[in-house]
Curated annotation (Swiss-Prot):
Function per UniProt: Converts the prephenate and L-arogenate produced from the shikimate-chorismate pathway into 3-phenylpyruvate and phenylalanine (Phe), respectively. Involved in floral volatile benzenoids and phenylpropanoids (FVBP) production.
Gene Ontology cellular-component terms listed: chloroplast; chloroplast stroma
Catalytic activity of the protein: prephenate + H(+) = 3-phenylpyruvate + CO2 + H2O; L-arogenate + H(+) = L-phenylalanine + CO2 + H2O
Bilayer-crossing regions: none
EC category: lyase
Compartments where located: Plastid, Chloroplast stroma
Chief localization: plastid
Originating organism: Petunia hybrida
Domain ACT residues, every copy: 331-422
Name the UniProt record assigns to this protein: Arogenate dehydratase 3
Record flagged with keyword Amino-acid biosynthesis: yes
Occurrences of domain Prephenate dehydratase (ranges): 140-317
GO biological process: L-phenylalanine biosynthetic process
Amino acid sequence: MQSLTPSSSGINIKLLNRKKIQTHRVTPSRVVIKCVYRFDSVNAGAAAVNTGVVNTPASNNTAGHVGASRTDWQSSCAILASKVVSQQQDTEKSGGAGNITAVNGHKILNLDLLPVESNRAKPLTITDLSPAPMHGAQLRVAYQGVPGAYSEAAAGKAYPKCEAIPCDQFEVAFQAVELWIADRAVLPIENSLGGSIHRNYDLLLRHRLHIVGEVQLPVHHCLLALPGVRKEYLTRVISHPQALAQCELTLTKLGLNVAREAVDDTAGAAEYIAANNLRDTAAIASSRAAELYGLDILEQGIQDDLSNVTRFVMLAREPIIPRTDRPFKTSIVFAHDKGTSVLFKVLSAFAFRNISLTKIESRPHRNRPIRLVDDANVGTAKHFEYMFYVDFEASMADVRAQNALAEVQEFTSFLRVLGSYPMDMTPWSPSRDA
């Protein structure tokens, strides 16, 4: 018997030896819906016998719900502990288990979800911890969003035969790999139109995962709505903030001077419209999302530039061994020390060795947000403190890269290699069918 205790929750789960069991699938709820599972007494008893899960007093909030077997982790509708806590806080603020404020301020009643059969992947749950796959088992890859998201397509491109695991937040995908729920995570890091995904840069520093690869995915946006809805009926458009930014000019050219509201992900916007029968709202998402959620495509290729590409990074618990027989890229993060022209000196370490930089991104140093002029001027900010993220074209197996980082370390108070990994050299061209 093996006991797994995730650090992010007080739930103690005991898993017995695996065996093939018969389980029920349940329809997933979105983040904005408070879910309650309802089983009849026969099903509840059968689930307890089949799964062999021992519920402890610390796991009362999972008692009588979906079991914690490996099959169930893909079928559950709960979320990781961070979201459970935030959901409880929302309930306390609202004064009880009444109506819950959902996306864009709409009210949604609590739902009792009955077990139904569905082939669609289900969100993760903290009760679904299971050991890493045995040798030869299918690779499990976490991505942010729901089925139909561009991140799901990127996961399929990076690992063609993987089992994609949807996560409701970027941080949940990081936690899924750290807790051995998933073997890899594929997350967006930058877009050719919308720029950097700052949230993921911050998470790369907070978590100890390693970048083991990258994949570039051409993004083809569509305007989706319920069947029968016309563009002139629309009063708002919802999607991920990056998607809204990537389609801003095109929406204006289409005469859609409507409210534009941000949600967690593109496919989630399509799912939200379908689930709530919103006939005055359109979503910006992929054509696959239209197929999955029964929406019509009002316009195709609405991104402002057909050469719209998102770069994703592949994350793992352990780094890969760098090589020199193919193009490699290395990602680092550092905080420069006090002194004049420090950033220039750091960048010169690469220039003197003919190492090309492909990206440099600055993010505020959270532990030291500002630097003061002197003790006599307390409260006067001289300048902000920053962390710098740099990508350069060289492998850590290359002596030039090793010497460059040795020199960089002389001028920095903090330096960390996020990963040294093969570059995505797959050729692509702008296409309306991407």
